[in-house]
Each structure stands twice: as C-alpha cells, then as structure tokens.
Amino acid sequence: MTPAARIVAMLGVVALVITVTSCSHHTTGKAASTTATSPASTTSLAPVAPVTGPALPPFIPSPGVGADCRYPPSTDPAGKPAGTPQTGKVATDPAGIGLTIVTDRGRIGLQLANNESPCTVNSFVNLAQKAYFDNTECHRLTTAHALSVLQCGDPKGDGTGGPGYQFADEYPTDQYPPGDPALKQPVVYPRGTLAMANAGPGTNGSQFFMVYRDSLLPPAYTVFGKINAAGLTVLDKIASAGVSGGGEDGPPATEVTITSARRD
C-alpha cells in the first residue's frame, strides 16, 4: 500500500493529516487568526505565505508524566524485530536528550524532549539503540502550504510498518481534557518540530515526522523534540527537490535513507 494523506475540508479550511497508512483517521477544524514564529529557512525553498493558527499549548507538567509508560502489542505485527522498551516509570531527567540521525543526505541533529514526552522518547531512544532505524527510507514528503513534513521511521518503507507495539499520546494531547473539542482544531506545529505519526489515539509506534515549514495539525500528534539548524538545512534541500512524480504528497524525489540514528 502506498502512503496517503487524508484531506478534509470544513468551513473552507483544508487540513492534510499525518497518519500511518493503515488508518482511517480524519481531522477537521478552523484555524484562528494568530501566527506562530519559527526558525527561518536558510535554503532555496520557494517562499510561501505563513500559515495562521493558534500556537501549541504551553507544557504544564503533571505528576503522571513518565510515571507509567506502557507499550502493549499493536494490531499489526512488527515490521522489524524491536522488542519492547522499558515499561513503568521512566526518568524525565535529563530534560533533553541529544540524538543524531545520519542520512545519505546529511546529518539531522535532534534534541529530544524527555521532560515533556518521556514515554515517547524512551521508545525512540530504545529503537535507535537497537539499530531499528538503520537502512530505512523516509517514505513520505508533503509540500502543501499547511503541511510541510518529511515522514520516516517505517522499516517497510511504505507507510504501514511499525515496531509491533503502540503507546499513548503525550504532549500536546495531554494538555487537553479527554474529549475536548479543541483536540480537533488545528494548531501550528512550527518549523523544527519532531513529532509522532499515528493511526488514531494511542497508536504511536515508530513512524515520526519532521516539520520543515510551519504546519497546521490538530494537537493529536505527540511532539517529542526539536531539529537543529543543520538538520533543517538538510530537510530544506530534500524538500526543495519536491515529491516524486510531482504533487504535494508522496515519496520524496530525492530518496532519503537513514543510515544510523544514535544517542549523542
């Protein structure tokens, strides 16, 4: 199955949705009239009008952050053997963890938000240490005005693969009460954001996306880190080549292979 984006139009607003391909997850919403700021592009990406919408909510820690990380089996088998990360309570100190993704297009430095999304970081670091991401392709590039991301982390390379387990959403989803209508309203995921793709609530696995231009998404995608300036330059170069075959969503025209991902 090829990667796909769900496009939903409501009240004149169009949102492209980041998903694991097997999902049928739909989101809708109307953007507000504020603008988030983010690091400027340093390459030849074509200029576009800034997206407008409310910013991600501030992180307010709760006693439950990192207190009980669980990784139950997913409905789909593992695309590559990975085992299960440490379960139960995980440390939120240090607050930030450095990790570098090395690709055949350059190095992408990450600062993982261990204090905000520790269960996600725990899984991501575990997968990296087990070489799970090594020799995998970043299978999806989106270049739409409201969604500009590179999606990676699938060992199958077609948008359907995962580690064989799943886990709950963290920041920013956990900043809202369950069932809050605001969870369906787009917010700005700023340039430089590292977040998880999913197939609906609580279905995080191994697929993640990197935002190279401010994008509008509902706050249903766990943010677990930031991309450094050098990494954004690499992403800009990949994005400037566009999508294979044209269009705004599909495999990147410049193939991207992760050769390694390791904690700094």
Indicate where each model-derived feature is located:
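Cyclophilin-like peptidyl-prolyl cis-trans isomerases
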Residues: 2-8, 12, 17-264
